[in-house]
């Protein structure tokens, strides 16, 4: 099964969403959810109008994987992950996290990996939680 990578990025006015590995699939919105919905609508239109000449990735089964830039992730999940909680999980200073969320500073690849590993670890842990 192919993976269609949709990149979510925060611009100054809205959120962009586009397929990283399939040229021509785009969307945007005022929120991450709107951008996701819009890029899915764009994908359906792309398939409809290119059905006789689809890129290889769209010819068979595929799944969508969303990849966020740091500002998009931090803003979108700010009601779930406080800066304090993220600092405890990652060791990244809250002030730095605020700079990354606002786009004032760009995190290094090492910092992005640190956040990614912490979130993926939490995801794995939570997927094993069940209530009696």
Task: Enumerate the language-model features and the residues they cover.
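Short, charged, surface-exposed hinge/linker loops at domain edges
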Residues: 1-3, 40-132
């Amino acid at each position: 099964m192919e993976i269609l990578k949709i990149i979510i990025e925060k611009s100054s006015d809205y959120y962009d969403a586009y397929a990283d590995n399939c040229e021509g699939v785009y969307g945007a919105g005022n929120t991450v959810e709107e951008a996701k919905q819009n890029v899915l609508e764009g994908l359906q239109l792309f398939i409809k109008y290119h059905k006789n000449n689809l890129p290889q990735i769209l010819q068979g089964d595929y799944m969508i994987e969303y990849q966020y830039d740091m500002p998009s992730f931090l803003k979108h999940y700010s009601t779930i992950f406080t800066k304090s909680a993220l600092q405890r999980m990652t060791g990244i200073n809250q002030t730095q996290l605020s700079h990354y969320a606002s786009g004032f500073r760009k995190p290094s690849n090492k910092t992005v990996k640190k956040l990614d590993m912490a979130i993926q670890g939490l995801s794995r842990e939570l997927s094993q939680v069940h209530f009696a």
